[in-house]
Design a protein with these regions (language model features):
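A solvent-exposed beta-alpha-beta segment
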Residues: 2, 150-187
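Short, glycine-/aromatic-enriched active-site segment of Class I SAM-dependent methyltransferases
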Residues: 43-66, 70-73, 77
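Short amphipathic alpha-helix with an adjacent loop that forms part of the alpha/beta core around
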Residues: 1-8
Length: 187
């Protein structure tokens, strides 16, 4: 229906919605149908490398079905006739990627993309030991945070949360920051 009414697209964009897609095969099948030759799909996603490096476990929550790194995403895309050809690093959400994709061989891979692939390989994000170490750091962070907040409460001071986004709920629930620690939260 979209093709019939509007024709093929030169550019399709999606910022911070990709992690919510529950059927990537169907999504990319339709993107390929909608993109004209030399068309570009641009998505912006929180970057898993930064999540691990900066201990951003609060960005993990029920609505996010995927966390993106370039190596497996590009491998998947190549199997379905697409590729990543460029990438930009963004500061939003603790560090995000704007990823530029096309049908295979429509565009030459940029130096930025190649450098980030090398950085991902060096980071060994697919190594289970790296992920276990991350989990251990998360547990340690929870203990440290609850200790600091408990000490603040013991001194008779208030602990409040300003704003309560989904990410905040992950932190509050995982760290068990309930009414005994938090005086109130406000949006």
């Amino acid at each position: 229906k979209i093709l019939k009414n509007f024709g093929k697209a030169k550019i399709i964009t999606g910022s911070n919605v990709f992690a919510h897609i529950d059927n990537l095969d169907l999504f990319f099948k339709n993107v390929k149908k909608l993109l004209e030759n030399q068309g570009v799909l641009i998505i912006e996603v929180p970057y898993f490398l930064n999540l691990i490096k900066n201990l951003e476990y609060d960005t993990i929550y029920h609505e996010h079905l995927s966390y993106i790194t370039l190596i497996p995403l590009n491998k998947y895309l190549r199997k379905i006739g697409m590729q990543i050809f460029d990438v930009e690093e963004k500061d939003i959400h603790g560090g995000s990627l704007r990823i530029f994709m096309s049908k295979i061989n429509d565009y030459k891979k940029t130096t930025k993309f190649i450098k980030l692939i090398k950085r991902e390989k060096q980071a060994k994000l697919g190594d289970i030991k790296k992920l276990v170490k991350f989990a251990d750091k998360v547990k340690k962070n929870r203990l440290e945070l609850t200790s600091v907040l408990t000490n603040i409460k013991k001194k008779g001071k208030s602990v409040v949360a300003l704003s309560a986004p989904a990410k905040g709920m992950t932190l509050l629930n995982y760290c068990k920051l309930d009414k005994d620690i938090m005086d109130f939260a406000t949006e």
